[in-house]
Structure formats: structure tokens, C-alpha cells
Amino acid sequence: MKFLITGGAGFVGGNLAVMLSESGHSVLCIDNLSRRGSENNLKRFKDYSNIHFLHCDIRNKEDMSRIKFSPDVVLECSAQTTAVDGYNNPMYDFTNNTAGVINVLEFCRERNCGIIFWSSNKAYSGDFCNSIPMHETETRFVWSDSKYSARGWSHLGFNEDGDLNGGNHTIYGVTKNAADILIQEWSSAFNIPSIINRLSCIYGPHQFGKVSQGWIVWFALAKKFGSQLKYYGFEGKQVRDCLHIEDLGNLILKQSQNIHSHFGSYYNVGGGIENTTSVCELSNNLDLRMNISHLETINEGPRRADQKIYISDISKVSSEFNWTPKISLDDGLESVLSWINDDSVDFSWIKQ
């Protein structure tokens, strides 16, 4: 198959490009190279003759028209991915995460190809997620009432029946939500094969995490290089399900090969109930694995629209694609630490 990957020099896009190439597929990556770490992925691509790169910005329709490659599927990985930055510059989130997607959809319509889109767990509002009864333990929030029921939620996590309405999605979440609905509409109106994945926490090697995004890898990097760590609210008891990038790649291969039989479908995708951690649990886990003393952690106020618990119910995607995550959080962290300890990777920016 032939793949066009937008945001192809980023963490998800770059890893998918390599995985697809190693599976024998042809890949064109496009990226505006605005994200730190992009240059490292470009270096990786040089080892693969079937990965090509074009400097391109999806916000620019003329850039998209320069693409001569005709893919079978577009993997739409481009985004401004930081949930908190949009409050400072909402238009930047909108142009990257919503308006640019329209250009990608029009490209798909003109080239008669499918699209797989990276949406977000922020499609579901913080108000809804935090309305589920919960209590605190020493290290995490836990759902409380075994008899409680709500549309879009069970003790396996949040499922696709959840309402996209409500407040506190974050600006980032709203722009991804809008793109999510746009893709559903374009797919229906113009017969574009589409699959939407509402992703939870994705992590793994080659993720240049930072304070505001990519927190699992950021914590590992900060601990290795002695940078200050902060818990933003709730003493780090917020819980997420975590999915390793290799498991995501295996799912994308299955979805790409079956996109026509899952036309217009959307899925919650993450590590699921078996792969969860709180922020402070992750910090303690890394201390043990890295054999370091616990660094002092500053507690600051919570971020707006933060979900105290978000765990994906992956029943639907698991059933329809015969897919489940294979890499445990423990094994996934070991892969991250192995990459961080690779002397050939440039981490000089974190020391500045």
C-alpha cells in the first residue's frame, strides 16, 4: 500500500513511517517541521529507501497541491498537540487542528483515497469525565460506585457512546472535536473512506516530550537530566491509560487494510483498563527503574479542563480489528529508557 503521513516527522507519524516501511509499504511524509525533534526523525528516514519527505504545511492549500504522490490512505497525524497552549493562542490551534484538516479532506476527495484521523480523548468533556463518582487513594483517583451507570462509561472506561457536548474540552480538544465531526461529514457526503481514532496517552521511543505534552517520556527525560518536575493539581493522582507506539502501529496496519469495511467508524483507542498509571505512580516507577533518588516535585494548581481519570474502553476497536495492546506499561517504559540512554540521540536542548 501507499501512505501519505501528515505530521510525518513527528513522534507518531515518524514511528508509523518506519513501521510501515519495514512492512514493505511506500510512504511519503509531509511536515512543516515546527516541532522539536523533527530533525531527528528526518535522520531516521535516510535508512529507508521507501520513505520520502516533502516539506509541506497542511494549512496551505498550495502546499497540498504540490503533492504528486497518490496514496491509498492518508494518516492524518498533524496537529498542535499541547492541550494547554490553545488558551494563549486559540487561532493557532484552530488553523492547525481544524482548518488544515479541511485541506487534507479535499486532497482525499480529489485523489480518491481514505483517511485515518488522530482525534483525542479530549473530544469528551472534562465536565463529563469528572462527573463519574470517584475517590482518592494514596496514589490515584479511583472510580467508586460499582452500581453507577452513565451513557458512555462503564468500569472498563469511556466508550464511544459518550456525548461530545459539554464544557471543558480544552481549546485543543474542541479543535480536534470539530475536525472529528468534519471528517464524519466529508466521509458521508463525498464517499471518503475514513476511520477516526480518539486516542488516550501514546508514548514510546523517539517522543521528545515536554512539560505540556508527552508527559511519560518527559518525566523520564527530566529525571535523567535533573530537570524540575511539577504535578499540576491533585498531587499527581490523575489517571490515564497508556498505549505504546508499536501497539498503535499494529492497529493502524489492520485499519488501513480494512478501511473500506469500516467506513466512517470511530473508536476510543488506548492501553485500556490493563495499562493505567497515575502521574505520581509513574514518577515512583521511574525512580525504581532508573535507580535514582526521588526528585523533589512541586505541586501547582490544576490545569483547566483536566480529566481526573481517563481510561479508554477499547472493547469496540479490539473486537472489530482483533487487536489488543501487547506491550505492558512496564515493558514500554523499558523501551523508552533504552532509547533515552542511547548516546547517539541529541538531548542537549533539555540541559539548556
Feature roles, as predicted:
Residues 1-200, 335:
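N-terminal Rossmann-like NAD(P)+-binding domain of SDR-like oxidoreductases, especially those catalyzing
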Residues 16-22, 221-352:
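C-terminal substrate-binding subdomain of Rossmann-fold SDR/epimerase-dehydratase oxidoreductases
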Residues 6, 95-98, 172-173, 209, ...:
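Short, solvent-exposed loop/helix junctions and linker helices
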Residues 35-40, 62-71, 115, 166-168, ...:
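Short, charged helix-to-loop "capping" segments that act as catalytic/coupling loops
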Residues 59, 123-124, 202-204, 248, ...:
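Conserved sequence/active-site signature of Rossmann-fold short-chain dehydrogenase/reductase
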Residues 129-157, 171, 177, 181-256, ...:
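NAD(P)-dependent short-chain dehydrogenase/reductase
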